[in-house]
Curated annotation (Swiss-Prot):
Pathway named in the protein's UniProt entry: Amino-acid biosynthesis; L-histidine biosynthesis; L-histidine from 5-phospho-alpha-D-ribose 1-diphosphate: step 3/9
Coiled-coil segments: none
Reaction catalysed by this enzyme: 1-(5-phospho-beta-D-ribosyl)-5'-AMP + H2O = 1-(5-phospho-beta-D-ribosyl)-5-[(5-phospho-beta-D-ribosylamino)methylideneamino]imidazole-4-carboxamide
Function recorded in the entry: Catalyzes the hydrolysis of the adenine ring of phosphoribosyl-AMP.
Residues engaged in binding Mg(2+): 82, 84, 86
Domain of life: Archaea
A Pfam family hit: PRA-CH
Cofactor: how and how many bound: Binds 1 Mg(2+) ion per subunit.
Lineage: Archaea, Methanobacteriati, Methanobacteriota, Stenosarchaea group, Methanomicrobia
Family: Belongs to the PRA-CH family.
EC id: 3.5.4.19
The protein's name in its UniProt record: Phosphoribosyl-AMP cyclohydrolase
Gene: hisI
Length: 129
């Protein structure tokens, strides 16, 4: 376990929708928002157990470890729950980029589509078939 979370909030006490809760991932030092994803009970438990973020893929209907393919893992430093108990904030140390498009953050574009984020890797080189 990455830190002492006991007593951990019971997942059933969280206000999940269809067993999923939104997780906002933020860089622990810079406070940059890196990504948002969903967690189910298993993903949260695995994250707490390993100290590496795990999420539930709604499209693939399976658990996934962030960085499993790319090596760009997120080392969890702290987990917070919001006042309504319907979302989580994960403060992490990001290794490499968080975005599968090659950027440090998934929020690399503004509303007009202009790239405003830092590209940190080439996806074609990382996600070779």
């Amino acid at each position: 376990m990455f830190c002492n979370l006991s007593p951990m909030i019971d997942f059933d006490a969280l206000k999940s929708e269809k067993g999923l809760i939104l997780a906002v991932v933020q860089d622990q030092l810079s406070r940059e928002v890196l990504m948002c994803a969903y967690m189910n009970r298993e993903a949260l438990e695995k994250t707490v157990e390993t100290g590496i973020t795990h999420f539930w893929s709604r499209s693939r209907q399976q658990l996934w470890k962030k960085g499993e393919t790319s090596g760009h893992v997120q080392k969890v430093k702290e987990i917070r729950v919001d006042c309504d108990m319907d979302s989580l904030l994960l403060l992490v140390e990001q290794v490499g980029g968080a975005c599968h498009m090659g950027y440090r953050s998934c929020f690399y574009r503004n509303l007009e589509g202009e790239v405003v984020g830092e590209k940190v890797f080439e996806p074609d080189e990382v996600y070779k078939s």
